């Protein structure tokens, strides 16, 4: 359950939205023009890993964003369109004529080449997946990484290809399906590549992006969480003044970091509200209360409404209906508690940068909803409060780094992601207190096993699922007919894609034995070996 997440913070309270300058305003910046690639966020994260602030904007808004941001360099992303289509997306010529370094990736290479007078052809030499390119000439992007004449693995995903160079460019790499795979104009500092350096499947991709950021654009890297902390505190003080702030704590990392940062800025002007809906992991409510009320001395209102939530969920089996029921009820409870606190002028949310950019549509049409996001929705409008969103410029890994900078314990900052609806979506079918207790205990054993094996920080997310089926078993001399527990563990860098974790069979066997022996009501354990895609990380 998370109060602090919203799909589009700027659209929640038009009259009271945060209009103060971004913390990033004083830093070196790179603008990323998004043409609709599924992995554009990875570009931004790779740039941030170099200590440089990056911001993603849709191509339709790129010209205005460039004028406002005054970036030191620009990256053109990939995308699903063809530059040969009528009304194909393009980069504003004002950017290409501004004298700043430009890097084009996949579609970004094609539109850069075409807009500057080159030729792009489509259709006949599609390349998808792993490929090998050969370096035919040196260039600044390759410095210290790739050598002339060498062959290197990359990740391709394209149908069109550049067949004639624009004036001033030279080809510096080739591949079987794209003879002009990397192009360079050293005078204008324009570079472009047909493959995707931002994905892990291009082993040297992060180094190539580093060369563009550091050696081509000449940026020094002044984006650190220590600097962000100091600047964010000043921004919060300027925005809030003497006003009061309430913050919904979920038990997750985002809301916790937001709360500690805001408390450092304004002290007891902040009150946190922790709504325990009865769908949390084992001992989670106690750990949240202990951390904030006793360790940080942050004013905290703890509300136990588990009976109310379980009553509302009785008979509900559809996962979307579960999410919507929990979301609506949370808003009702949080609103009542916030009014009881009284006098709050601001609502704090742990909105992250992906929450802001995920809502952008690049075609003007609707996007497919895979799962509803559980958030506070219209709370600020209903309660006539303004938003404080101190983390809205950060990615998840940056939030964790900020949490450590703020002194939050590693055991808390490094916790695996936990869904807003909690255990409700890890218990397919109808939810009962009995099922939740079985699931809590099984999950606690599983996580304990992972920690003892030293694997917790290696795994992106791990959890148990209580399946809506029973199986026959034999325990002692008797027949059992009990529940089946599914175990899930994945590795990922961002949650957008994920692979199942390849546990040793001995680990799985030992874990299954512990769960069956220690958790009453379970007689069978299975392990989920589905990656994302085709599956999602959570079961519902």
Curated annotation (Swiss-Prot):
Active site: 106 (nucleophile), 196, 198
Transmembrane segments: none
Domain of life (superkingdom): Bacteria
Secreted listed as a keyword: no
Matching Gene3D superfamilies: 3.30.300.10, 3.40.50.880, HUPs
MF-aspect GO terms: ATP binding; GMP synthase activity
Record's keyword annotation contains ATP-binding: yes
Signal peptide start and end residues: none
EC number from the UniProt entry: 6.3.5.2
Subunit structure and binding partners: Homodimer.
HAMAP family in the cross-refs: GMP_synthase (MF_00344)
This protein's name: GMP synthase [glutamine-hydrolyzing]
Organism for this UniProt entry: Rhodopseudomonas palustris (strain ATCC BAA-98 / CGA009)
